[in-house]
Design a protein with these regions (language model features):
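Beta-strand-rich ligand- or partner-binding modules
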Residues: 1-209
Length: 210
């Protein structure tokens, strides 16, 4: 960050923290000095957050396709939980919300997951999807796997999505979702989308009429 006191977004809790500092001065007779570093931590929303897209390859460029993002949270007893989900794409992509389902692993196996009907889509940029649920996902909430469905189109050879979860009652509580292989219902093993090598044309069936 550029200003003192600005917030940073942390991944899931880590054992170590690495800092890199660049010090500058406008006076050639004076040297910049770093006297102290102070960090203020928010409580984590979860002990671990992992995510995976259901498809890692788009067959056609420029054509909207529905994608599912599966998020698997792991909670410690003291974690505060989350009720917001944020998904980001590169600037040339846009996101349209389709649905959100939550359930325990047993409910997913038995196709008894709950489709949330009262999900707020909060205003943000077109390349982001900011959702607020009507409940808090936390330890014991029978939400071991979450599916966020949205529609998007790919216009390049590939894109990496970013996801985070947050608690609406706490400022700057966003916590990063790490890419991983979280469920057999998805095949991407991460948060990357690639264009098909067999058909990666943005334009097709182009005709020039007199």
């Amino acid at each position: 960050y550029a200003e003192s006191g600005a917030s940073i977004t942390s991944p899931s809790p880590r054992q170590f923290l690495s800092l890199r500092v660049r010090m500058m001065t406008d006076d050639p007779q004076s040297a910049a000095v770093l006297r102290s570093v102070r960090l203020n931590f928010n409580p984590p929303v979860a002990q671990q957050l992992q995510g995976e897209l259901d498809k890692g390859v788009f067959a056609e460029l420029g054509q909207p396709q529905e994608v599912s993002l599966f998020i698997k949270p792991v909670f410690a007893p003291q974690d505060i939980g989350f009720d917001e989900i944020l998904v980001r794409t590169p600037p040339d992509m846009s996101l349209k919300f389709s649905g959100l389902r939550v359930g325990s692993l047993e409910q997913w196996e038995n196709d008894q997951v709950e489709e949330l009907t009262d999900v707020q889509v909060l205003e943000t940029r077109s390349d982001s999807l900011w959702l607020r649920m009507d409940r808090l996902v936390r330890r014991g909430a029978r939400a071991e796997l979450i599916e966020v469905k949205f529609t998007t189109a790919l216009f390049s050879s590939g894109a990496v999505l970013e996801a985070a979860t947050g608690n609406s009652t706490l400022d700057n509580s966003w916590q990063q979702v790490d890419p991983a292989d979280v469920t057999d219902r998805a095949e991407s093993q991460g948060l990357q989308i690639l264009a098909s090598v067999t058909d990666n044309k943005v334009l097709s069936d182009v005709q020039v009429l007199p």
